[in-house]
Amino acid sequence: MAGKTLKVTQIGSPIRRTADQRATLIGLGLNKMHRTRELQDTPEVRGMIRKVQHMVKVDEA
Protein backbone atom coordinates (compact mmCIF):
# COMPACT_ATOMS: atom_id res chain seq x y z
CA MET A 1 0.00 0.00 0.00
CA ALA A 2 1.51 3.29 -1.09
CA GLY A 3 0.92 5.99 1.50
CA LYS A 4 0.91 9.72 1.03
CA THR A 5 4.23 11.47 0.74
CA LEU A 6 5.40 14.91 1.77
CA LYS A 7 7.91 17.02 -0.12
CA VAL A 8 10.09 18.74 2.49
CA THR A 9 12.56 21.48 1.50
CA GLN A 10 15.06 23.10 3.85
CA ILE A 11 14.80 26.89 3.61
CA GLY A 12 16.51 27.93 6.85
CA SER A 13 20.07 27.55 8.03
CA PRO A 14 20.89 25.37 11.05
CA ILE A 15 23.59 27.84 12.12
CA ARG A 16 22.95 29.13 15.67
CA ARG A 17 20.15 26.60 16.21
CA THR A 18 19.97 24.13 19.05
CA ALA A 19 21.63 20.75 18.69
CA ASP A 20 18.30 18.92 18.72
CA GLN A 21 16.98 21.06 15.84
CA ARG A 22 20.12 20.30 13.81
CA ALA A 23 19.74 16.60 14.60
CA THR A 24 16.10 16.72 13.52
CA LEU A 25 17.06 18.20 10.15
CA ILE A 26 19.64 15.45 9.67
CA GLY A 27 17.01 12.88 10.66
CA LEU A 28 14.78 14.25 7.91
CA GLY A 29 17.66 13.92 5.43
CA LEU A 30 18.17 17.67 5.16
CA ASN A 31 21.69 18.92 5.72
CA LYS A 32 22.12 21.59 3.03
CA MET A 33 20.06 24.61 2.11
CA HIS A 34 17.35 24.10 -0.54
CA ARG A 35 17.69 20.31 -0.42
CA THR A 36 14.39 18.51 -0.99
CA ARG A 37 13.34 15.08 0.26
CA GLU A 38 10.15 13.08 -0.28
CA LEU A 39 9.14 11.44 2.99
CA GLN A 40 6.27 9.19 4.02
CA ASP A 41 3.41 11.04 5.73
CA THR A 42 3.57 9.47 9.20
CA PRO A 43 2.94 10.95 12.65
CA GLU A 44 6.66 10.62 13.43
CA VAL A 45 7.70 12.61 10.35
CA ARG A 46 4.98 15.20 11.02
CA GLY A 47 6.35 15.65 14.56
CA MET A 48 9.88 16.15 13.26
CA ILE A 49 8.62 18.69 10.73
CA ARG A 50 6.70 20.54 13.44
CA LYS A 51 9.89 20.79 15.51
CA VAL A 52 11.74 22.61 12.71
CA GLN A 53 8.75 24.20 10.94
CA HIS A 54 10.50 27.58 10.83
CA MET A 55 13.33 26.07 8.72
CA VAL A 56 11.41 23.90 6.24
CA LYS A 57 8.75 24.23 3.56
CA VAL A 58 6.29 21.34 3.17
CA ASP A 59 4.26 20.42 0.08
CA GLU A 60 2.06 17.38 -0.36
CA ALA A 61 3.46 15.25 -3.17
UniProtKB/Swiss-Prot annotation:
Q: Which GO terms describe its biological process?
A: translation
UniProt entry keywords in alphabetical sequence: Ribonucleoprotein, Ribosomal protein
Q: Which GO terms describe its cellular component?
A: cytosolic large ribosomal subunit
Where does the chain cross the membrane? none
- A GO term, aspect molecular function: structural constituent of ribosome
UniProt cross-references to Pfam families, sorted A to Z:
Ribosomal_L30
SUBUNIT field: Part of the 50S ribosomal subunit.
- NCBIfam families named among the record's database cross-references: rpmD_bact
Family designation: Belongs to the universal ribosomal protein uL30 family.
| Protein name as it appears in the record | Large ribosomal subunit protein uL30
Organism from which the protein derives:
Rhizorhabdus wittichii (strain DSM 6014 / CCUG 31198 / JCM 15750 / NBRC 105917 / EY 4224 / RW1) (Sphingomonas wittichii)
- Taxonomic classification: Bacteria, Pseudomonadati, Pseudomonadota, Alphaproteobacteria, Sphingomonadales
Q: Which gene encodes it?
A: rpmD
